Amino acid sequence: MTKIIFMGTPEFSVPVLTQLASTYDVVAVVTQPDRPVGRKRVLTPPPVKKAALELAIPVYQPEKLRTSSELEELIALEADLLVTAAYGQILPNSLLESPKHGAINVHASLLPEYRGGAPVHYALLDGKTETGVTIMYMVEKLDAGDMISQRKIPITDEDNTGTMFDKLSKLGAELLMDTLPDFLAGKITAIPQDPEKVTFARNISREQEKIDWTKPGRTIFNQIRGLSPWPVAYTTLEEKPFKIWEATYEETKEDGEPGAILADKTTLKIVAGDGTLIVPTVIQPAGKPKMDVHSFMTGAGRNLSKTTRFGE
């Protein structure tokens, strides 16, 4: 049976590991160290570690694999293949070149578009109507290896980064399992990435989280769903942070300055730069838990002044 080392960390990686382990001999799982989580800073294992322990697979958690003693242990396993999916560290050539069939990665974009750590976020931020998964060879340069297989999936207006992560993790697992038989048999010729089409999905900055109400409504709508459920787009209301977790978009145009409020007893609408409307459905005022807009408008939102604007 083919011996595989699997490397991954978040929930996205779990279906890939589970599918691999159902058919192949996964001899080791490498994931990030346990991290403090939440206000109480409880030391919490990554999702992949939990899944690996349930499957009784040995787990390695080096802080920095490149300088870890565990690197030589992994090479000594003499695996046939290394598979990664959102692991979170650049791997040294000594490990990439050690397996018989090399090292491959399950990446959540249609490469060469969106190399980097936030491809799902950027697909939504940019208003894409489709994205997908690419399986490619691992090289030391970030997400730059030749492409082995690729599969597309649509993005709808009802999707956000959370729903797309779920869809892409399942798609990635399916594509990998469909690809491996021919790949291991040497029947697939990998295709180099077109350097003219390379784009990058760098980590989201705090500046990208803040809503600019002078922008078009569609752009703001894409920002809200692209940053949900993490890190969440925000604006300000009476100079205090105000997060918008979920919203819909109305192309109907209204008169009003960017950030102007149109509200009744149960709904809240905000005017964008082009006059179209953002309609928040799940929000989080400063110092409060997240809530549906109806609850807000029948509570603190009742006192919103018609002259109040978001972003001020």
Curated annotation (Swiss-Prot):
GO molecular function: methionyl-tRNA formyltransferase activity
Domain of life: Bacteria
Cellular component GO terms, alphabetical: cytosol
EC number: 2.1.2.9
EC class name: transferase
Catalytic activity: L-methionyl-tRNA(fMet) + (6R)-10-formyltetrahydrofolate = N-formyl-L-methionyl-tRNA(fMet) + (6S)-5,6,7,8-tetrahydrofolate + H(+)
UniProt cross-references to PROSITE patterns, sorted A to Z: GART
Presence of the UniProt keyword Coiled coil in the record: no
Keyword annotations from UniProtKB, A to Z: Protein biosynthesis, Transferase
PANTHER family tied to this protein: METHIONYL-TRNA FORMYLTRANSFERASE, METHIONYL-TRNA FORMYLTRANSFERASE, MITOCHONDRIAL
HAMAP family: Formyl_trans
Function: Attaches a formyl group to the free amino group of methionyl-tRNA(fMet). The formyl group appears to play a dual role in the initiator identity of N-formylmethionyl-tRNA by promoting its recognition by IF2 and preventing the misappropriation of this tRNA by the elongation apparatus.
Protein name: Methionyl-tRNA formyltransferase
Species, as recorded: Listeria monocytogenes serotype 4b (strain CLIP80459)
Origin organism lineage: Bacteria, Bacillati, Bacillota, Bacilli, Bacillales
